[in-house]
Design a protein with these regions (language model features):
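N-terminal lobe of the biotin/lipoate ligase/transferase fold
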Residues: 1-95, 211-214
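Contiguous, small/hydrophobic- and glycine-enriched helical/loop subdomains that border
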Residues: 80-121
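Flexible, glycine/charged-enriched surface loops at secondary-structure junctions
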Residues: 112-120, 246-261, 336-340
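Internal, well-ordered alpha/beta segment that forms a basic, Gly-enriched binding/recognition surface
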Residues: 113-117, 123-180
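A conserved active-site cap/scaffold subdomain adjacent to cofactor or substrate pockets
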Residues: 158, 167-192, 224-252
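Active-site- and interface-proximal helix/loop "cap" or "latch" segments in soluble metabolic
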Residues: 180-183, 302, 306-348
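Intrinsically disordered, low-complexity terminal tails and inter-domain linkers enriched
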Residues: 189-229
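Structured beta-strand/loop patches that form or line metal/cofactor-binding pockets in enzymes
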Residues: 256-303
Length: 348
């Protein structure tokens, strides 16, 4: 596996680079660590206008970009750290998320954090979501990526993202802000807890016995020394990089010719209105359903009882070609039960 940094906080460029590596650097496996500044990233199958607070996006000059993977909308700023695994797999579409999530959870747990998976595509710490992940497949290769909320402006995320009231009701939460958390804050709590527990042990036993009881000897103190008093994101970046590249990993640079191709993908795809907003559809009928795999919605235009146009949206993840499914509906008579059955089949 080789390591690549984007050296950019431009979301349109970063997603273009990711796509280029997935589709063209097929000779090896890659790890990327990167950041986007002041950006909403929309899932591939989502209705952009339904996911953003358009007034706030304009007011705060927020970038909006659609990624190539499924899942839900997320806010990125320079308090986030994003990671991507791009690997060759013999049976790519059967690769479970856990293969890629495990090393991230392992690294977080080494810091004393109670990290675990929640559902199919979230990482939580003490009930707070700190990461959402997604993946897609391309000719025997897998792109798996996720965002780690380290010190994000959560109030900004809450303001610029629009959450469907049905989703909030289903999850039993009141807002984006109430269900996500920052690793830095949770890490501070964990470090303090480790210090208290270590001090209590030392008061009762010898220092050696206390260290043995802690599992990772004095891990809290070690991380305070490594991260510094401010627990900065650059220190967390360096820590995560060291954990994920512990077995030795060559850092790779793209050639000028390759970088020109990345710019071409950025300009012609990710930095266009058509890609980021163009899937939206004014509808006569909206059918919406929630399954364990996520939310799915069909927006349908009718002409004399027949389907004139259709779009399928959602925060689910699927390798199926939604465009082909949408096209297959055009010209058919509209029957509610058939649409509901189709939506169920899409997310299976």
């Amino acid at each position: 596996m080789k390591y690549i940094e984007t050296y950019s906080t431009n979301p349109y460029y970063n997603l273009a680079l990711e796509q280029y590596i997935l589709e063209n650097r097929t000779d090896d496996d890659y790890l990327m660590l990167w950041q986007n500044d002041n950006t909403i990233v929309i899932g591939r199958n989502q209705n952009t206008y339904a996911e953003i607070n358009a007034d706030a996006v304009v007011r705060y000059k927020v970038n909006v970009v659609r990624r190539g993977t499924g899942g839900g909308a997320v806010y990125h700023d320079l308090g986030n750290l994003n990671y991507s695994f791009i690997t060759r797999e013999a049976d790519a579409e059967k690769i479970a998320f856990e293969k890629f999530v495990y090393p991230i959870i392992k690294a977080l747990r080494k810091l004393g954090l109670n990290a675990e998976t929640s559902g199919r595509n979230d990482i939580i710490i003490d009930g707070c979501k700190v990461s959402g992940v997604a993946q897609r497949y391309y000719q025997g290769r897998v792109l798996h990526h996720g965002t780690l909320l380290y010190n994000e402006n959560l109030d900004m995320a809450n303001e610029v993202l629009h959450v469907d009231p049905d989703k909030i009701k289903a999850k039993g939460v009141k807002s984006v802000r109430s269900r996500i958390g920052n690793i830095r804050e949770l890490l501070s709590i964990a470090l303090i807890k480790n210090e208290i527990e270590a001090s209590a042990d030392i008061a009762q036993k010898t220092a050696d016995e206390a260290a043995g009881k802690l599992g990772n000897p004095a891990e809290g103190r070690k991380m305070i020394e490594q991260f510094g008093a401010d627990l900065s994101l650059p220190a967390f970046w360096a820590y995560l990089k060291s954990e994920l590249t512990a077995d030795g990993m060559q850092q790779e640079q793209l050639t000028p010719e390759e970088l020109a191709q990345v710019e071409k993908i950025k300009t012609e795809k990710y930095d266009t209105w058509e890609w980021n907003y163009g899937r939206s559809l004014e509808a006569d009928i909206v059918r919406k359903a929630h399954y364990p795999q996520g939310w799915i919605e069909a927006r349908i235009q009718l002409d004399h009882g027949r389907i004139k146009d259709a779009r399928i949206y959602g925060d689910f993840m699927t390798p199926k070609d939604l465009t082909q499914i949408e096209q297959s509906l055009i010209g058919r008579e509209y029957h509610e039960e058939e649409i509901d059955k189709l939506l169920e089949d899409v997310v299976k």
